[in-house]
């Protein structure tokens, strides 16, 4: 199979083809997802919750992400690999460049950062140093204490307008992908249509350019909790590989996410 690149993901958007993505944290699952045809794999700071048992993503370190990025890269031949910049790992320019370099050296093809237009100068600096950037707007888990919990964002007209404005600013600054999390479906559609870069949704409705799920949610192995925007594909198919294949099929056909997995 041909190796997935950021330009290839852009071509998918331009052709109206949905992008499929999952989180991955080790070589074995990365290999499985890669072989099934998932377009992009994210080493997410969600590992703090699903692997380390934390209540949120804040304790995750850059070394944690680098370790798992190395593992995922070893299991991946064709999928595009993104790695999260964890909480407070990009507080200053010097810190940002050093930490991004660590993730790229570990095997990432792009780093993902949570935040709005305040990141624009940082994004420009990373691009100048050869580091591609993915943005992340909507519910940004590193800001959970600012939001007062894991809540849907952008329901108020003023919030939606601000988010759309920030998405445009991030694109202008140089991001090449955007993850949009937990926003009303109408806002997910508006952002995707307003940007030329691919928008990957998680709880952002079916009209984004692609979808991403946390693998533990897709397999139904997150302890006692299933987010509204997720679907347990393992219980439906009874086999991990079939679950991944069904997820890809549903995203590409537009069957997932359905209204029950979306916010209004």
From Swiss-Prot:
The active site is at residue 181. It is an enzyme of class 2 (transferase). Its cofactor is Mg(2+). Gene3D superfamilies: Phosphoenolpyruvate-binding domains. This is 3-methyl-2-oxobutanoate hydroxymethyltransferase. It catalyses: 3-methyl-2-oxobutanoate + (6R)-5,10-methylene-5,6,7,8-tetrahydrofolate + H2O = 2-dehydropantoate + (6S)-5,6,7,8-tetrahydrofolate. GO terms for cellular component: cytoplasm. 3-methyl-2-oxobutanoate binds at residues 45-46, 84, 112. It comes from Alteromonas mediterranea (strain DSM 17117 / CIP 110805 / LMG 28347 / Deep ecotype). Keywords: Cytoplasm, Magnesium, Metal-binding, Pantothenate biosynthesis, Transferase. InterPro entries: Pantoate_hydroxy_MeTrfase, Pyrv/PenolPyrv_kinase-like_dom, Pyrv_kinase-like_dom_sf. Belongs to the PanB family. Its EC number is 2.1.2.11.
């Amino acid at each position: 199979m041909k190796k997935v690149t950021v330009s290839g993901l852009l071509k998918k958007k331009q052709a109206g083809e949905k992008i499929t993505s999952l989180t991955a944290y080790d070589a074995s699952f990365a290999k499985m997802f890669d072989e099934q045809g998932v377009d992009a794999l994210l080493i997410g700071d969600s590992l703090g919750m699903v692997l380390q048992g934390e209540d949120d993503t804040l304790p995750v370190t850059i070394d944690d992400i680098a370790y798992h990025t190395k593992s995922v890269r070893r299991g991946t031949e064709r999928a595009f690999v993104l790695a999260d910049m964890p909480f407070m790992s990009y507080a200053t320019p010097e810190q940002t460049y050093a930490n991004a370099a660590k993730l790229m050296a570990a095997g990432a093809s792009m780093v993902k950062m949570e935040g709005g237009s305040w990141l624009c100068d940082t994004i420009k600096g990373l691009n100048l140093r050869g580091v591609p950037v993915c943005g992340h707007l909507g519910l940004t888990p590193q800001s959970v204490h600012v939001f007062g919990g894991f809540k849907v964002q952008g329901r108020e007209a003023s919030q939606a307008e601000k988010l759309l404005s920030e998405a445009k600013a991030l694109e202008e600054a140089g991001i090449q992908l955007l993850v949009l999390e937990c926003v009303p479906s109408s806002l997910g559609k508006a952002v995707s249509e307003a940007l030329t870069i691919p928008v990957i949704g998680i709880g952002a409705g079916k009209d984004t350019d692609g979808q991403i799920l946390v693998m533990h949610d897709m397999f139904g192995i997150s302890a006692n909790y299933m987010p509204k925007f997720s679907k347990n594909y393992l219980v439906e198919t009874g086999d991990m590989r079939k679950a991944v294949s069904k997820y890809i099929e549903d995203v590409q056909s537009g069957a997932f996410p359905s209204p029950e997995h979306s916010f209004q």
